[in-house]
């Protein structure tokens, strides 16, 4: 395996971040259930370039974590290039001299904040912002779905936003396959504790046919949250969440429940009698009527009646953004063959192989044998559409920089050293591979 002859070690989140020597860790962004994310500066660029570094410390901890890591790596590589999907620049895997894993690293495009921070902020949002965000989500979904992939974990925290209102979807670790032949679908990934507020009813009811409609439901929940500045469905658990949905949408038709619910769930729902539901107009007073019409089509209880991504893109609410040139499909479908691997040793080898296969693609010179790997060439890795606003993109009011990070962290424009503010220490670290 190739080795890097020189790296630097930074301390953050109580962990060693062992990085390519051309990166300087500058701040802590967040801690997820699967990874730790920091901001960094790439020192070899002519201009100051910021990159997000995501460390997965427990990538080989168990089969679920290993598959999630592999799924993330492969999908970010496959979907790389869409303007509304976060860009993966490079990958790395670092072991200590004793052979213990330090972590798998993903060097990603650094965005200023996530959509949940914007929603929770006091900043005034206009209807044009909502339209822009939903349109960009749908453009990305059309691309993702055309690759026979379901995201399965769309929520505001997984939607990254810049001050120019550009939005990008991230976190594909819980994605699953989709086919018109439902027998070959992998179904919703079980075994993870994730937010249920954006889960479609068919997932709550353990329906076996996971379709593109699950992501449309999540997008509807996000639209409702933008309009109301708070989540529409806030269940404490699966049962409570289902109750929240029923109280707003009302009791679904009997034939719908017979198709997607077990007999036990069917009996549970009908013990309440006929729940009338509430109008979206009463829940979201003052909202654009066209937004509410689209919302109703997205939050349809029956997944077969839910609006498709193609029809949603053509909805009148999004007409000011509708541009067929931005609504393109992925040219190649994604294959989830690795999902059927059960051996931890084989899964671990697949992760290592994926890391180094990707590095060969994005680094300036191929990595081979035991020769030192080449330095990153970030300028070569970044396409024009990542660093420039699309010429047809409409201009919206910018967001203030205070939303770049969570409240206790400085923004990217601060002149104060991040490591002094956040207790990040750095030292030279030689010979770690």
From Swiss-Prot:
Induction field: Accumulates in large amounts when cell wall integrity is compromised.
Kindly list the GO CC terms recorded for this protein: cyclin-dependent protein kinase holoenzyme complex; cytoplasm; nucleus
Question: Could you tell me which residue ranges the Protein kinase domain spans?
Answer: 23-318
Q: What class of enzyme is it?
A: transferase
A Pfam family this chain is assigned to = Pkinase
Substrates-to-products reaction catalysed: L-seryl-[protein] + ATP = O-phospho-L-seryl-[protein] + ADP + H(+); L-threonyl-[protein] + ATP = O-phospho-L-threonyl-[protein] + ADP + H(+)
Record-linked InterPro entries = Kinase-like_dom_sf (IPR011009), MAP_kinase (IPR050117), Prot_kinase_dom (IPR000719), Protein_kinase_ATP_BS (IPR017441), Ser/Thr_kinase_AS (IPR008271)
Coiled-coil region list: none
Active site positions: 153
Alphabetic keyword roster:
ATP-binding, Kinase, Nucleotide-binding, Serine/threonine-protein kinase, Transferase
SUPFAM superfamilies registered for this protein in UniProt: Protein kinase-like (PK-like) (SSF56112)
Please tell me where ATP binds in this chain. 29-37, 55
* GO terms of biological process kind: G1/S transition of mitotic cell cycle; regulation of G2/M transition of mitotic cell cycle; regulation of gene expression; signal transduction
Q: Which GO terms describe its molecular function?
A: ATP binding; cyclin binding; cyclin-dependent protein serine/threonine kinase activity; protein serine kinase activity; protein serine/threonine kinase activity
Write the Enzyme Commission number(s) for this entry. Answer: 2.7.11.1
Record family assignment: Belongs to the protein kinase superfamily. Ser/Thr protein kinase family.
Assembly and binders: Interacts with RLM1.
Q: What does this protein do?
A: Serine/threonine-protein kinase involved in the SLT2 mitogen-activated (MAP) kinase signaling pathway that regulates cell wall integrity. May also be involved in the mating pheromone and the CWI MAPK pathways.
User: Which PANTHER family does UniProt cross-reference here?
Assistant: MITOGEN-ACTIVATED PROTEIN KINASE
| Protein name according to UniProt | Serine/threonine-protein kinase KDX1
The gene it comes from is KDX1
């Amino acid at each position: 395996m190739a080795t890097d002859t020189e790296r630097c070690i930074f301390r953050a989140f109580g962990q060693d971040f062992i990085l390519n020597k051309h990166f300087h860790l500058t701040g802590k962004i967040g801690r997820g259930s699967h990874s730790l994310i920091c901001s960094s500066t790439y020192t070899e660029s002519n201009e100051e370039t910021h990159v997000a570094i995501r460390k997965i410390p427990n990538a080989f901890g168990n089969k679920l974590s290993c598959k999630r890591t592999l799924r993330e790596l492969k999908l970010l590589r496959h979907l790389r290039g869409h303007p509304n999907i976060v860009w993966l620049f490079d990958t790395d895997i670092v072991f200590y001299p004793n052979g213990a894993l330090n972590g798998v690293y993903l060097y990603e495009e650094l965005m200023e904040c996530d959509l949940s921070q914007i929603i929770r902020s006091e900043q005034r949002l206009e209807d044009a912002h909502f339209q822009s965000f939903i349109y960009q989500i749908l453009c990305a979904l059309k691309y993702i779905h055309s690759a026979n992939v379901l995201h399965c974990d769309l929520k505001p925290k997984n939607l990254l936003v810049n001050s120019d209102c550009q939005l990008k979807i991230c976190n594909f670790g819980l994605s699953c396959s989709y086919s018109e032949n439902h027998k070959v679908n992998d179904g919703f990934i079980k075994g993870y504790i994730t937010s249920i507020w954006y889960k479609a009813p068919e997932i709550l009811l353990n329906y076996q046919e996971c379709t593109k409609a699950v992501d449309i439901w999540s997008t509807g929940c996000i639209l409702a949250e933008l309009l109301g500045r708070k989540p529409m469905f806030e269940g404490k658990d699966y049962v409570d969440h289902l109750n929240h949905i029923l109280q707003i949408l009302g009791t679904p038709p009997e034939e719908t429940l017979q198709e997607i619910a077990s007999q036990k769930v069917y009996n549970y729902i009908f013990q309440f009698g006929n729940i009338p539901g509430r109008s979206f107009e009463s829940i979201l007073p003052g909202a654009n009527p066209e937004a509410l019409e689209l919302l109703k089509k997205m939050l349809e209880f029956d997944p077969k009646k839910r609006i498709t991504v193609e029809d949603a893109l053509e909805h009148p609410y999004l007409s000011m953004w509708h541009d067929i040139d931005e609504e393109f499909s992925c040219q190649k479908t994604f294959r989830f063959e690795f999902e059927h691997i059960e051996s931890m040793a084989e899964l671990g080898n697949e992760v290592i192989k994926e890391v180094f296969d990707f590095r060969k693609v994005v680094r300036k010179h191929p990595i081979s044998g035991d020769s030192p790997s080449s330095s990153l060439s970030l300028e070569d890795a970044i396409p024009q559409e990542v660093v420039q606003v699309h010429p047809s993109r409409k201009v919206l009011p910018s967001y203030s920089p205070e939303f770049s990070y969570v409240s206790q962290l400085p923004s990217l424009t601060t002149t104060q050293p991040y490591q002094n503010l956040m207790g990040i220490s750095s030292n030279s670290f030689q010979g770690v591979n």
